Amino acid sequence: MKGLRKYLSPFAPDQSGAAAVLCEFHGLIIILDAGGCAGNICGFDEPRWFESRSAIFSAGLRDMDAILGRDDRLVEKIGKACEKLSADFIAVIGTPVPAVIGTDYRALSRMIEKKTGIPALTIDTDGTKLYDDGEKKTWKELFKKFAVEKDVEPGRIGIIGATPLEFGGIYEEDFLKKYFAEKGFSKVVCYGMGDGLDAVREAAAAE
């Protein structure tokens, strides 16, 4: 049947979850799409984008770039963006387009790091799953990339998963930190909502 769509993106798909995790980590976030997915993320799924500085961009893929898999053009665009913006890392978030053409995310990550000298993450999301799947993949990649060995710090707790998609607000870290402080924790870290990349590097110090 011509025009039959077997898979439709949910209202808050996995790429939105990935962007929500990375929003406050001072990274250069690239949505690997033609333009529509990035607009939905910034316009509807990420309320912090309106009040804080977060470098979220669309890759602006054209038809032939996607069909032919011209990753070198994407890397060139990212390199030019890095000349104008300061970022602690670069993250490329997948959408249905790279899922259909079979983008090699591992190779893309290496190409970006070689071009820019900045750590790069690639998140293999495809736009057909719910936001929590994208969050899970992103947390995993983030901790694999940046967390280092640390001695455990008694009384320290790390909160994973605090995003506006989960809590419906953008100031929930105050409530969460107060709650766990009342439970007896002396150091409460809320990754990605109030606490940045340094907290991720020290994640192993949590009890």
Q: What function would you assign to each model-found segment?
A:
Residues 1-207:
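An N-terminal assembly and electron-transfer interface module characteristic of large anaerobic redox
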